[in-house]
A protein has these predicted regions:
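Hydrophobic alpha-helical segments within soluble ligand-binding/sensing domains
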Residues: 30, 77, 135-165, 213-214, ...
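Hinge/cleft segment of the Venus flytrap/periplasmic-binding protein
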Residues: 32, 170-173, 178, 283-334
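Extracytoplasmic "Venus flytrap"
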Residues: 33-54, 58, 62, 67-79, ...
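Periplasmic-binding protein-like
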Residues: 37-38, 89-97, 115-119, 169-170, ...
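Short, solvent-exposed amphipathic alpha-helices that sit
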Residues: 47-62, 144-151, 177-197, 212, ...
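Structural motif
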Residues: 66-90, 203-224, 240-243, 267-268
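Flexible loop/hinge segments that line or gate small-molecule binding clefts
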Residues: 105-143, 265-277, 320-321
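Venus flytrap/periplasmic-binding-protein-like
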Residues: 117-127, 233-280
Length: 334
């Protein structure tokens, strides 16, 4: 039932966004207001709703109209570009449902002379390589990873752990560039802080979700029965949560495990539990910055001919824990 409700919510949001855009296309406005699109793959997610909200704030500040559209798949993405062109839009920001759609999206946009900026996910070309010629606003993977490692070490010191009987469980997905850079950044920060390099153990996950990370973590834990304290590193909240679930299954108390995720939104239920778990906190990125900065750059490109940087890394993150998560999420409209 929960799954059905979520699907209905997605359909409703997608339908509303498309109807709104279609109305612009067929009826237009009475004025000559500049129109720019903002296309997202998962409109039901708080992250993208916040991006939309802050894109609209930029629109109010600079005097342009934001046409919000849901693009959950390739067909809807290409249709949305047709609709934007018909509405008179001059360009769009997009978080694509599939990075491999990059060449098709750019070909369609070029046919209408629309400018494009990508946000959150980078386009890939036919060979699977990043399309670095398309402007991108994205979370800074290596720096976020470094912050994860720094915060883990800081909390470990606060708890007075002995490094001699402590270890790092680094759940990896090295085939994904962002995941690899986050985990590598975290490990580098831990080593720099003084954590013993030979007690950092990498284990690959087959899937980037809780069950996949749980399986990976279990396979690692049984190899090191003498470790008393675990630091858990992963590319996002769910991989870290999988590691936490594994330590619980192996009998570790919450005070002997520290996991810090990345994303924040997926960590809320864990942080809201009545009793603390090994999941200490999460690094909450800035969808507000992504939404405002990406469409602001597009506006200046269209209006003033100021070509945007090809790659803007956003480093703004805040560590949310059981103590502050409600206040920090509220600040970002999540």
């Amino acid at each position: 039932m929960k799954t059905i409700r979520k699907k209905l919510a997605v359909a409703a949001l997608a339908g509303t966004a498309l109807l709104s855009a279609s109305a612009h296309a067929f009826f237009g406005n009475d004025d000559d207001t500049l129109k720019l699109g903002y296309l997202v793959k998962q409109p039901e997610e708080p992250w993208f709703q916040t991006e939309w909200n802050f894109a609209e704030k930029a629109g109010k500040e600079y005097g342009f109209e934001v046409i919000k559209m849901a693009v959950p798949d390739g067909e809807k993405t290409l249709n949305a570009i047709d609709t934007l062109a018909a509405s008179g839009a001059k360009g769009f920001v997009i978080c694509t449902p599939d990075p491999k759609l990059g060449p098709a999206i750019m070909a369609k946009a070029k046919s209408y002379d629309l400018k494009v900026i990508t946000v959150d996910d980078q386009f890939l070309n036919a060979k699977g390589k990043p399309m670095t010629n398309v402007p991108l606003v994205m979370m800074a993977a290596s720096q976020i990873g470094q912050r994860q490692g720094q915060e883990l070490y800081k909390e470990m010191q606060k708890r007075g752990w002995n490094p001699a009987n402590s270890a790092v469980m680094a759940i990896t997905a090295d085939e994904l560039d962002t995941a690899r850079r986050r985990v590598d950044g975290s490990i580098a920060a831990l080593k720099e802080a003084g954590f013993p390099a030979n007690q950092i153990y990498r284990v690959p996950t087959k899937t980037n979700d809780i069950p996949g990370a749980l399986d990976a973590a279990n396979s690692l834990l049984v190899q090191y029965p003498n470790v008393k304290h675990w630091l858990v590193v992963g590319m996002n909240d769910n991989t870290v949560l999988g590691g936490i679930r594994a330590t619980e299954g192996q009998g570790f108390d919450a005070q002997n495990v520290i996991g810090i995720g990345i994303n924040g939104v997926d960590a809320v239920n864990e942080l809201a539990k009545s009793k603390p778990t090994g999941f200490y906190g999460s690094l909450l990125p800035s969808p507000d910055v992504h939404g405002f900065k990406s469409i602001e750059s597009l506006y200046k490109w269209v209006k003033d001919g100021v070509e945007p940087k090809k790659f803007v890394e956003v480093t703004d993150v805040v560590l949310i824990t059981r103590e502050n998560y409600k206040a920090e999420l509220k600040k970002k409209g999540l």
